[in-house]
Amino acid sequence: MAIINRSKLTQTTMIKQILKRCSSLGKKQSSEYNDTHEHDGDSLPLDVPKGHFVVYVGGNRVRYVLPISFLTRPEFQLLLQQAEEEFGFDHNMGLTIPCEEVAFKSLITSMLQPTYI
């Protein structure tokens, strides 16, 4: 049991560090937006499967397609709060996460790992 708790503590610490690095990106992100993906009118891009959504991450605005289940995860909700504070949600840039891509990849990888209790 102690090993599991220690593992959870380590994962929690890692997630906190990742979120801290994400928030440090700040206003370094570009405010330009070029959406080069195919769209069907005002709907989602055609390459986004049902049950997924798109976010843009980092200074180069790398596009990620994520499962909607991430929206309920507290660590992802913190990123959304940072995005709202940084950019608001009323802009033409798509959902942009103010986070370095390396830190974001690390967070997503940890979120995809099964949780053992």
UniProtKB/Swiss-Prot annotation:
<dbReference type="GO" id="GO:0005886">
    <property type="term" value="C:plasma membrane"/>
</dbReference>
<comment type="function">
    <text>Provide a mechanistic link between auxin and plasma membrane H(+)-ATPases (PM H(+)-ATPases, e.g. AHA1 and AHA2), and triggers PM H(+)-ATPases activity by promoting phosphorylation of their C-terminal autoinhibitory domain as a result of PP2C-D subfamily of type 2C phosphatases inhibition, thus leading to the acidification of the apoplast and the facilitation of solutes and water uptake to drive cell expansion. Triggers plant growth probably by promoting cell elongation. Regulates branch angles and bending.</text>
</comment>
<dbReference type="GO" id="GO:0009737">
    <property type="term" value="P:response to abscisic acid"/>
</dbReference>
<keyword id="KW-0217">Developmental protein</keyword>
<dbReference type="Pfam" id="PF02519">
    <property type="entry name" value="Auxin_inducible"/>
</dbReference>
<dbReference type="InterPro" id="IPR003676">
    <property type="entry name" value="SAUR_fam"/>
</dbReference>
<comment type="similarity">
    <text>Belongs to the ARG7 family.</text>
</comment>
<keyword id="KW-0472">Membrane</keyword>
<dbReference type="GO" id="GO:0009733">
    <property type="term" value="P:response to auxin"/>
</dbReference>
<keyword id="KW-1003">Cell membrane</keyword>
<keyword id="KW-0341">Growth regulation</keyword>
<protein>
    <recommendedName>
        <fullName>Protein SMALL AUXIN UP-REGULATED RNA 54</fullName>
    </recommendedName>
</protein>
